[in-house]
Curated annotation (Swiss-Prot):
Keyword terms of this UniProt record: ATP-binding, Magnesium, Manganese, Metal-binding, Mitochondrion, mRNA processing, Nucleotide-binding, Nucleotidyltransferase, RNA-binding, Transferase, Transit peptide
Organism annotation: Drosophila melanogaster (Fruit fly)
EC number: 2.7.7.19
Known role: Polymerase that creates the 3' poly(A) tail of mitochondrial transcripts. This is not required for transcript stability or translation but may maintain mRNA integrity by protecting 3' termini from degradation.
Protein name: Poly(A) RNA polymerase, mitochondrial
Disruption phenotype: Mutant male larvae die at the third instar larval stage with a severe reduction in polyadenylation and increased mitochondrial tRNA levels except for tRNA(Cys) which shows a marked reduction and an accumulation of shortened RNAs. Mutant male larvae show de novo translation of some peptides, suggesting that polyadenylation is not required for translation. They also show reduced assembly and activity of respiratory chain complexes I and V. Heterozygous females are viable and fertile as the gene is X-linked.
GO molecular function, one term: ATP binding
Positions that bind Mg(2+): D230, D232
Gene that specifies this protein: MTPAP
Cofactors: Mg(2+); Mn(2+)
Length: 612
């Protein structure tokens, strides 16, 4: 009993030391967003956590106590998370975080290769826990009572029925929006797993490229990611991630590395690098499978699936603007606690009514929707968010960021220097209704949306929807949106405004006798067939069958000699024979025309009529 108490006290002391160390490192930069998390600190904290972590495959969550006792011999375990990967069978994994990276490295170094498999032996933070008795002698273990798992099946997404039940039990729309956000956003375990995937890529090339960095960006780190979202990675061989380093800050040296000269075409060089790196991922990295190289895209990427993390990963080497855009969105999300819940609700609404689609195409994307939300929050009488132009004007010399392509991504990283304070006190339900009302009246036909200026601009081209790219201002992030989809968006926001306004006036309305009440957001999240207005009546299908066109032409060719008849069904045998003879004569004349090269066949009946 006394040993258990001493062990618990030791764990508590280590945890207190760990927290003090991490909090001190985050507070080391004075004057940087006091009281508000900084993006660089957020990234750095999770990178350190990844360096202190390992992922071990186990038979079930019941193996945790045995795994804890075994792995405690390498260092102090600060926390453990359990998650499942559901494929043909359910696979169980436990993520262990040590107090230091050296302890995690000791656990990884104690691993052995699987002699039963013929794969290339690779050292990585992904291991599996085999049954006792096999392999080399286990270290001497001290029986300890393992602390409870911090999460059990921690990556399981909430199902639709359970989510609707939570929303139905909420007191009002405000609580519904918060419930939706809390139960669908990317949780802490999901973020940790994504940084582990990045660390695996970085460590794979650390021998040849010690300054290389693989950093997550996009929805995984900007605070707007949902459970199950893909991971976007950028791999850079330099450590500054595009930042300008003053020459006077560099330490002079007379020793210079020999390097390989690149091709004159930078894009071709990047494609060759990525092709080579894709082969390495496919052949050597544990867990990486289904590698696809998409090198001809505007931003060349490598897509792959990580089977131990159940992640879809997009790896690029030249998307620095996407990296800095993630930082900008993270700052917007941290400025006001209403920004992210409002964005999640609007994204969910768009998904429910079919405005967004998982596949790329003519539909509006989640990023474009997020830009619409940010622009709306800039347009309020009492704005909740500042303009990007104001952030750029408040930038200091240390905030300078310029990509290799010369794109200026400079804006202040210290929001407190901006002096922006929002006095807007609107509730989430009020903001949601105002969003729908704002875009139901917005002139998409003539006006463009600019987060940099914070006001509508004249459209520079005839795109159905024009949203100025916040960092590459010559580009339109919604260029893919078709005219039909833009009109659908206007109709759907009008529907939503009408439904939500009715819901505000009537707290809840029964759907029918014997049915549960459907109120608040549930009315917005109804299936499309229950919506008030559908835009399908305004647009005809644009897909046609080519064979039908030829049948119509052939049927129309007989209109001069016979009454109009269907192209396929013939009620008279003589008519069928006449049509067949006309087809045969036409084919013969076409052959003669191709053979002689003349422009008009002389035997054509139409020509004989003209000569008369």
């Amino acid at each position: 009993m006394n040993s258990l108490v001493r062990r618990s006290a030791q764990q508590l002391s280590l945890w207190r030391t760990y927290c003090i160390k991490h909090n001190a490192s985050e507070a080391a930069s004075p004057g940087r967003n006091a009281g508000r998390p900084n993006y660089e600190e957020f990234i750095g904290r999770h990178q350190r956590q990844a360096q202190c972590s390992i992922v071990v495959q186990v038979s079930s969550e019941k193996s945790y106590e045995e795994l804890y006792n075994y792995c405690s011999s390498f260092g102090s375990i600060m926390g453990a998370h359990h998650y499942c990967v559901r494929q043909d069978e359910t696979l169980h994994y436990i993520l262990l975080e040590y107090a230091t990276s050296d302890e995690a490295a000791a656990a990884i170094g104690a691993g052995v290769t699987n002699g039963e498999l013929s794969g290339v032996p690779v050292r990585s933070p992904f291991l599996w826990f085999r049954a006792a008795g096999g392999g080399r002698r286990s270290p001497k273990l001290v029986a300890n009572t393992a602390p409870a798992l911090l999460s059990l099946d921690g990556t399981r997404q909430v199902d639709q029925r359970h989510l609707l039940g939570l929303l139905r039990g909420a007191a009002d729309i405000e609580e519904q929006v918060q419930q939706l956000y809390e139960h669908t956003r990317l949780n802490e375990l999901g973020i940790r797993m994504r940084f582990l995937a990045a660390l695996q890529v970085q460590q794979a090339i650390a021998g040849m490229f010690p300054a290389a960095q693989a950093q997550p960006f996009g929805s995984s780190v900007n605070g707007f990611g949902r459970m199950g979202c893909d991971l976007d990675l950028i791999l850079r061989f330099d450590s500054d991630m595009g930042a300008k380093i003053p020459l006077e800050a560099a330490v002079p040296s007379r020793l210079v590395y020999h390097t390989k000269e690149n091709l004159s075409n930078g894009r071709s060089q990047t494609q060759r690098h990525m092709e080579c790196f894709g082969d390495m991922l496919h052949l050597f990295l544990p867990g990486v499978c289904h590698v696809r190289r998409i090198l001809q895209a505007r931003v060349p990427i490598i897509k792959y699936h990580h089977e131990h993390l159940d992640l879809e990963v997009d790896l690029s080497m030249s998307n620095l603007t996407g990296f800095y855009m993630s930082e900008l969105l993270y700052m917007f999300g941290e400025m006001d606690p209403r920004v992210r819940p409002l964005t999640f609700t609007i994204r969910r609404w768009a998904q429910t009514c079919g405005l967004t689609n998982p596949s790329p195409g003519r539909w509006i994307s989640n990023f474009s929707l997020t830009c619409l939300v940010m622009f709306f929050l800039q347009q309020l009488r009492q704005p909740i968010l500042p303009t990007i132009g104001a952030l750029a004007k408040a930038a200091e010399p240390g905030d300078s960021r310029v990509t290799e392509d010369g794109i200026n991504c400079t804006f202040t990283r210290n929001v407190d220097r901006l002096g922006f304070r929002s006095r807007n006190q609107s509730s989430l339900s009020e903001l949601l209704l105002q969003f729908f009302e704002f875009y139901s009246q917005f002139d998409f036909h003539n006006r463009a949306i600019s987060l940099n200026e914070g006001k509508p601009l004249s459209k520079p081209d005839h795109s159905a929807m024009y949203i100025v790219n916040p960092l590459e201002q010559l580009l339109n992030v919604s260029k893919n949106v078709s005219l039909e989809e833009c009109e659908r968006l206007r109709i759907e926001v009008r529907n939503a405004a009408w439904v939500l306004e009715s819901e505000v006036e009537n707290a809840s309305v029964p759907e029918g006798d014997g049915q549960e009440l459907s109120c608040g957001l549930l009315n917005l999240f109804k299936h499309p067939e229950k919506a008030v207005i559908r835009p399908n009546m305004f647009f005809k299908p644009r897909m046609v069958e080519v064979s039908d066109l030829f049948e119509q032409k052939e049927a129309g060719a007989t209109s001069s000699s016979t009454p109009p008849t269907p192209a396929i069904t013939y009620k008279s045998a003589s008519v069928r024979q006449q049509v067949q003879s006309i087809k045969a004569a036409t084919r013969s004349e076409l052959k003669q025309l191709r053979g002689s090269g003349s422009s008009v066949p002389t035997s054509s009946p139409n020509n004989r009529r003209r000569s008369r």
